[in-house]
Amino acid sequence: MRGWRWLAPAVVVLLAVTAWPVGRAVWTSLFTDPLPGSADRAFVGTDNYTAIVSSRTWWEAVATTLVIVVLMVAVQLAIGLAFAAALRRVGRPWPIAQLLLLLPFGLLAIVSAVVWRDAVTTGFAAQWFGLDDVGPFGALVAVCLGEVWRGTGITTLILLAGLHRVSPSLLASAVADGATSWQRMRRVVLPAAAPALAVATVYRALDAFRILEGPILVDDPGATVRTAPFLVWDTTFSSLELGLGAAMSIVLLLLAAVLAAVLVQLLRVRRIV
């Protein structure tokens, strides 16, 4: 109960900021597409939600989003853990290393997507690997790599904070007992850094679940990689189906909540959080 007292101010602010837009989206989702105040606007109840549940396009977009989430989180955790271990071994990270790690994440998502698009279409990556026409799979890989490039830095810093929780005396005892590097990592380092791993996993998974900029810019736009957030954007702003787009945004919000709950439960089962 004491922990909730510390969380209460942040929860109140979060609810105050999100209550109006979420409520407005729910209200909009109950009507047909014309703009509010239009004479052609009609109440349709849950028809938009029924259309989403029965839409193959929607569930294909959700599946694509989940594939991206799994790939991005796995790669970011692996690279981030390797970088964090290297920085911990060096000692105090160099300022230039911190800058290079956080620079992609510090950019606006749309800016980093533009940088990555130029790299894989007309820049160094296109010249090195001959990326003239990468196809659907190549577009998916390009989108994933762009997000990995943007998010690995913050993942590294989260994991580095977790690695600093490892007691040097405990590592020295493991070395004295003859433990190998892999045994020390598995038996000593990872259990101590487990809370940081949990935070990084949930944070990066939810961030990956809202991926939009990559499919719009790298894939020109959404030609082969159609994620659920992209479908919401395309339905709302390109097709101007406001009611259906609002319903999609609510369903996407619920799916993100389910994803977070599942991840937290899995981490609790493994006694990580």
What name fits each language-model region?
Residues 3-273:
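A structural signal for multi-pass alpha-helical bundles of membrane permease subunits
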